[in-house]
Amino acid sequence: NDFDFDQVFEKQVQALGRPGDVLVGISTSGNSRNVIRAVDAANALGLHTIGLLGGTGGALQGKVGLPLTVSCTPHTPRIQEGHLLMVHLICERIEEIMETPA
């Protein structure tokens, strides 16, 4: 309880992240300090990073390995709906890959 809210995700990444893991950061502005710090920690540990972002992508646009940005609207609810669609598509693709025999 002695840590700032800006560190809430960063501390988890530092404790649990391993090279080869994937961190997905979600921020409608791309400027959420707690997500930025988590991405910075992930990058320092060699994790792959994906950003579900909005607008211009903010500060996270240049920090994540794969920025996925909903830039067609400035409205937070629409950005979040775009993020939800992205998550569903990503999960669907992962399921397809896992079901395919090697």
Model-predicted segments: where are they?
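Glycine-rich phosphate-binding loops that contact phosphosugars or nucleotide phosphates
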Residues: N1-T100
